[in-house]
Regions:
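Non-catalytic cap/lid and distal C-terminal segments of serine-dependent acyl enzymes
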Residues: 1-208
């Protein structure tokens, strides 16, 4: 895009930066892009080396993700701001599936950098079976498991920024969405408990 609100697009599980276009998402929102309302910055993931790298310890997986976190915040964000000619610009985070996890996690950890999130069909806790983390390992990844750490956030600095942000979380109700529905409901509950405005949308039973 040539102008508009910047979005960082996180790919789905083990995905690449070009997947968003390959899955038809660019075409679907082309009207907004061409009208100068939004501009997209699609990034690679390191899921294969972090949360899905079952060959290494939880600590190593967490450390790899933290390196990715620094890359996004310290390198990608400055690039986006320079590109937008807006040195204080807060960007939006967007993603589907594992990309939704990243979109929510980055927003919650860095609300001074991210203005909000649009997350679609994500899992928001790292104790899900697909991540293969034991109960003993979970404390070491606590601060990257949104449904874990969000419950304990009471710092007014974070809460005030959350309440002034744009939060949209959607999930289908079709096949394979059970865990995503459960996590979305829990996220919705936590937002309500903390008086954080959010648009939570449950799509049809034909959507997955």
């Amino acid at each position: 895009g040539h102008w508009g609100k910047p979005f960082i697009i996180f790919p789905s599980s083990r995905g690449r930066y070009f997947d968003y276009e390959g899955m038809g998402m660019i075409e679907a929102i082309a009207g907004f892009i061409n009208a100068g309302k939004i501009k997209l910055f699609c990034v690679d993931s390191v899921d294969e080396a972090s949360w899905y790298n079952y060959a290494v310890s939880a600590a190593d997986r967490n450390a790899r993700h933290e390196a990715y976190d620094r890359y996004i915040v310290e390198e990608v964000i400055p690039f986006v701001r320079h590109h937008c000619q807006s040195p204080q610009e807060r960007v939006m985070a967007n993603g589907c599936s594992m990309g939704a996890y990243h979109a929510v996690n980055f927003f919650l950890k860095h609300p001074d950098v991210f203005e909000g999130t649009i997350a679609l069909s994500g899992l928001y806790r790292l104790d899900r079976p697909e991540f293969q983390l034991s109960a003993a390992e979970l404390p070491g990844v606590y601060f990257n498991s949104p449904l874990s750490y969000l419950a304990g956030i009471d710092d007014p600095w974070y809460l005030d920024l959350y309440r002034r942000s744009k939060i949209i979380v959607c999930v289908g109700q079709g096949a394979w969405e059970d865990e995503a529905i459960e996590d979305t409901r829990r996220l919705d509950s936590l937002f309500r408990e903390k008086s954080i405005p959010a648009w939570i949308d449950y799509w049809g039973h034909d959507v997955n």
